[in-house]
Amino acid sequence: DHEAAYATLIEGMDKSLGDLMDWLEKNGEADNTIILFMSDNGGLASTSEWRDGPLYTQNYPLLSGKGSLCEGGIREPMIVSWPGVAQPNTRCDKYLLIEDFYPTILEMAGVKDYETVQPIDGISFVPLLTGTGDPSKGRSLFWNMPNNWGNDGPGINFNCAVRNGDWKLIYYYGTGKKELFLSLIHI
């Protein structure tokens, strides 16, 4: 049963994270440690050999999954623990990109005067964690996936997308098809 195996993996990850957090607490480091916990993409939804059930439904209500530019492939939850800074038990539905982690971690670490070989693409999301601002407001996000994942499905293979607010446009290189979405809650 694929779902039982998947649940076992999740249970193992949960146990490992719990062990780490217990160690930090036991050794007096919990209040001096920032934890960022997230996935790198939506769940695998385009192949039946790893999961049970109909394809492209594993991230319901979001459409599709890993390798897709639909919301099931690019929207992932994230948990942040930053004692004394990020308010516990709060929720934020703003969006960001992986490129935002580098400037965020630098800011969290108090690194201010640094030099880079090239410009930093990301924007620190510390204001979202402190409740002092919204760096995603008015910002466009871009994805380019000109590769073949070996499977086909919603938002998968040879495409690119741009998102601004609740609007997203997906363009399929192979067919020239365009899909425009508004209100990204269920796509």
Label each PLM-derived region with a short phrase.
Residues D1-H2, Y56:
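Aromatic- and acidic-residue-enriched carbohydrate-binding clefts of CAZyme catalytic domains
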Residues H2-E11, Y95:
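Catalytic nucleophile-loop/oxyanion-hole region of alpha/beta-hydrolase
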Residues Y6, I10, L17, I34-S39, ...:
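Beta-strand elements within well-structured catalytic alpha/beta cores of enzymes
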Residues G12-E49:
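Metal-dependent active-site segment of extracytoplasmic phospho-/sulfohydrolases and closely related
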Residues F37, S68, I74-R75:
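Alpha-amylase-like alpha-glycosidases and glucanotransferases acting on alpha-linked glucans and related
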Residues G43-L69, A86-K94, E99-F181:
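C-terminal cap/loop subdomain of S1 sulfatases and analogous C-terminal strand-loop tails that border
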Residues I185-I187:
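Conserved small/polar residues in nucleotide/adenosyl-binding loops
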